[in-house]
């Protein structure tokens, strides 16, 4: 069943991209033309690919409200890229029926940003809150997608790095306030919240289950997201590492953040 979406803006452009023509902008308005545009391009993906922000609004029932902002790409491999993004968005908007009464009210509100786009990878982050009527309070959360543009597979932290005790040690020594596009705490509280992630305060360590640790890439570094105590003001915490500080643990042959 098609997703209910609305367009929020003109297509966003990566640095150095030429302005899209009026005809190209119009082509982004329908999924069918996304497919045609993809078919007419070569299999090579470049940083000239552009996108527009859309809003996913399909609610699971009439009691609920869903607003999830997401990027819709056009250009080469757009159909495959958009399918991966939309699958994540639909998952964010869904409820496990075994955990809740029939047709509960759910309000979901998420923003998103493309944090890195080049010929090798697209990295997208979503952040916002979910309020379910049977829950004590709304929860805040962050989701991330890192799409390898050659394999069209999702890339996780453990695909990128050897996450071991040495990596964890470097994290707590070198991590810094991530600034744009999303931070769950103020810069003034960053050191305090980082300390709360150490084994002195948090057991098991968030790095124990690195498979599920969320991350997104930026031009200069990688941002890791981990759970936080709700009473501290947010349900998640983010910290950034420069690629140069963790190069010894990097696994892939290709350098994703370089063209």
Enumerate the predicted regions with their spans:
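Compositionally biased intrinsically disordered regions enriched in Thr/Gly
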Residues: 1-259
